């Protein structure tokens, strides 16, 4: 419990949002919405800054039909597997956001943990709403109204192409140069 979170040098969280809309309510990101009390507790009690890999950056990581097709060319079995497990998300993102593709949130948090050059942002005090209509919303005090010590690094920018190179290289084992060449053709 308390011991588990206090002894960490670094903490990367795939959750929250700064300026982006929510993905399970108008304002909340799903992970924080599921257990807002836990998210708030961690933000308020961790002794190191939380790297918030929120919807502001994860929404920029879109598995497009072209990338999905490329995955199937790289490895038919793995590509088909990815296609099958993302079908729900393709439908969700089309219905609610009119995006042709699938936002793949979680892999960005892992990639950022491995390579901090992928994302950038700013430090701020962050908390999480635990009640009412905005339950689960991450509240980022970007303008320092509360004059509280910064407890987070809120990520707002991501190098989408470099993420995709890293992701495809790690999952499919192809050379980064080969992947970059193809991605130049299929990523706008």
Q: Where are each of the predicted segments found?
A:
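Short, small-residue-biased leader/transition segments that mark boundaries at the very start
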Residues: 2-5
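Residues at the starts of beta-strands that form the adenosine-phosphate
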Residues: 9-10, 49-51
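Conformational coupling and interaction surfaces
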Residues: 33, 37, 50-188
């Amino acid at each position: 419990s308390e011991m588990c979170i206090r002894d960490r040098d670094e903490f990367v969280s795939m959750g929250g949002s700064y300026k982006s809309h929510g993905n399970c309510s108008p304002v909340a990101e799903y992970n924080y919405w599921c257990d807002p009390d836990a998210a708030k507790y961690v933000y308020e009690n961790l002794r190191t800054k939380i790297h918030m890999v929120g919807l502001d950056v994860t929404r920029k990581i879109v598995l497009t039909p072209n990338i999905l097709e490329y995955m199937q060319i790289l490895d038919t079995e793995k590509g088909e597997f990815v296609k099958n497990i993302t079908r729900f998300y393709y439908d969700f993102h089309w219905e609610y956001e009119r995006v042709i593709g699938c936002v793949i949130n979680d892999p960005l948090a892992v990639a950022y943990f491995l390579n901090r050059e992928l994302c950038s942002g700013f430090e701020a005090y962050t908390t999480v709403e635990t009640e009412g209509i905005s339950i689960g919303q991450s509240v980022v005090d970007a303008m320092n109204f509360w004059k509280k010590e910064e407890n987070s690094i809120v990520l707002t920018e991501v190098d989408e192409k470099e993420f995709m190179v890293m992701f495809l290289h790690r999952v499919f084992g192809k050379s980064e140069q080969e992947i970059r060449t193809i991605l130049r053709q299929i990523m706008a």
